[in-house]
UniProtKB/Swiss-Prot annotation:
Record family assignment: Belongs to the IF-1 family.
Gene Ontology CC, one term: cytosol
Protein name: Translation initiation factor IF-1
Locations listed in the record: Cytoplasm
Pfam families registered for this protein in UniProt: eIF-1a
Keywords (A to Z) from UniProt: Cytoplasm, Initiation factor, Protein biosynthesis, RNA-binding, rRNA-binding
Gene Ontology MF annotations: ribosome binding; rRNA binding; translation initiation factor activity
Superkingdom, natural source: Bacteria
Gene designation per UniProt: infA
Chief location of this protein within or outside the cell: cytoplasm
Listed HAMAP family: IF_1
Domain S1-like: residue ranges: 1-72
PANTHER family in alphabetical order: TRANSLATION INITIATION FACTOR IF-1, CHLOROPLASTIC (PTHR33370:SF1)
Membrane spanning residue stretches: none
Organism from which the protein derives: Maricaulis maris (strain MCS10) (Caulobacter maris)
Length: 72
């Protein structure tokens, strides 16, 4: 099975939601719901409102994503 192509977009966290999910506004003005990636949870990287992040999305559902990096 081939690995699916993931889309990566920079964005900004606008709201914290329950269960480690976040509302993220992408640079192209779209708003999505994103959760933190497993490695970020494992290393206890905190994500707060206003943080600049890198979001990974699948081309099949462009309303959900995964936060893979928090910019310093």
């Amino acid at each position: 099975m081939a690995k699916e192509e993931l889309l990566e977009f920079p964005g900004e966290v606008t709201e914290l939601l329950p269960n480690a999910t976040f509302r993220v506004k992408l640079e192209n003005e779209h708003e999505i719901i994103a959760h933190t990636a497993g490695k970020m949870r494992k290393n206890r990287i905190r994500v707060l409102a206003g943080d600049k992040v890198l979001v990974e999305m699948t081309p099949y559902d462009l309303t959900k994503g995964r936060i893979t990096y928090r910019f310093k």
